[in-house]
A protein has these predicted regions:
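Extracytoplasmic
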Residues: 15-49
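Flexible cytoplasmic inter-helical loops of multi-pass small-molecule transporters
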Residues: 212-245
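Helix-loop-helix hairpin linking two adjacent transmembrane segments in secondary transporters
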Residues: 162-213
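C-terminal ends and interior cores of transmembrane alpha-helices
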Residues: 88-117
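Residue-level signature of mid-helix packing/kink "hotspots" within the transmembrane helices
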Residues: 32, 60-68, 136, 170-171
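Cytoplasmic helix-loop-helix junction between adjacent transmembrane helices
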Residues: 127-167
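Helix-to-loop junctions at the C-terminal end of transmembrane segments
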Residues: 66-78
């Protein structure tokens, strides 16, 4: 690369690393918030520990499966769109979860006791399992983006820095939801979903603006040695990858 191209590549590389770090941290905002809201849901809604534990178990199982499924899908799609849309959908699932009491009350009528409680628990369970699946849209596109933008010889070092996004996201949501529950009391559990969801939805918009799928998307050459700089056509001849936006 010439000096100008190298500067542009460095800029986009840094931008991609920072954007994906922030984005992946926000996936934790709309997953780890559940545990912090649990005491409030027990007190305010009367949901049992058994139901809440079942939500967590199913969420974890579906999340594990979804990482495999989403990994396959992310390899075949634009990683920029995949990550941004996935985070936005996680945020919407959290918004819906926070409105579960209102949804069940509106559909079945307020104050009807057991039926409303069952409907609310079912709605919450569906939303949290759905969120578990959508959480799997976080890491696979990051892995794809980073391997396109970081040379193999730098990958271990820069991935070590990137991996702090897990701890940053989990730590910040503890502070945020801890403050919310301390300030609003048991009834503040809803805001443990609404506020992280609002932040994450805004973050999804930032991801869509900040990320680009590959270096060729911005007129830069692919990194040598990754195999991405060439592809085979029908005649098995090597040619440069076409530019993608």
């Amino acid at each position: 690369m010439d000096q100008d191209t190298s500067k542009r590549f460095k800029y986009w590389q840094t931008r991609t690393i920072i954007a994906t770090m922030v984005g992946y941290a926000l996936f934790y905002f709309v997953r780890k918030n559940f545990s912090l809201a649990m005491p409030g849901m027990e007190t305010d809604l009367g949901i049992t520990k058994t139901s809440l534990g079942l939500f967590l178990t199913l969420n974890g199982l579906v999340y594990g499966l979804s990482r495999f499924v989403n990994g396959i899908l992310a390899d075949r799609m634009n990683a920029r769109y995949y990550m941004a849309i996935g985070l936005a959908l996680c945020a919407l699932a959290n918004f819906a979860f926070g409105f579960a009491e209102s949804v069940s009350g509106t559909l079945l009528g307020w104050g009807i006791g057991k039926n409303q409680m069952q409907a609310m628990i079912l709605f919450m369970g569906v939303m949290w399992v759905l969120n578990g699946f959508l959480q799997g849209t976080g890491f696979p596109p990051c892995a794809r983006l980073l391997t396109h933008w970081i040379p193999p010889k730098e990958l271990a070092t820069k991935m070590s820095v990137w991996n702090t996004s897990h701890s940053i996201g989990a730590g910040l949501v503890v502070i945020l939801c801890g403050y919310i529950m301390g300030h609003y009391g048991a009834g503040g559990w809803k805001y443990c979903f609404f506020i992280p969801a609002a932040i994450s939805f805004a973050g999804a918009i930032v991801l869509f603006i900040a990320l680009r799928d590959t270096p060729t998307s911005v007129g830069l050459p692919e990194i040598p040695g990754t195999g991405a700089e060439y592809k085979k056509d029908g005649k098995k001849k090597l040619r440069l990858r076409t530019k993608r936006f």
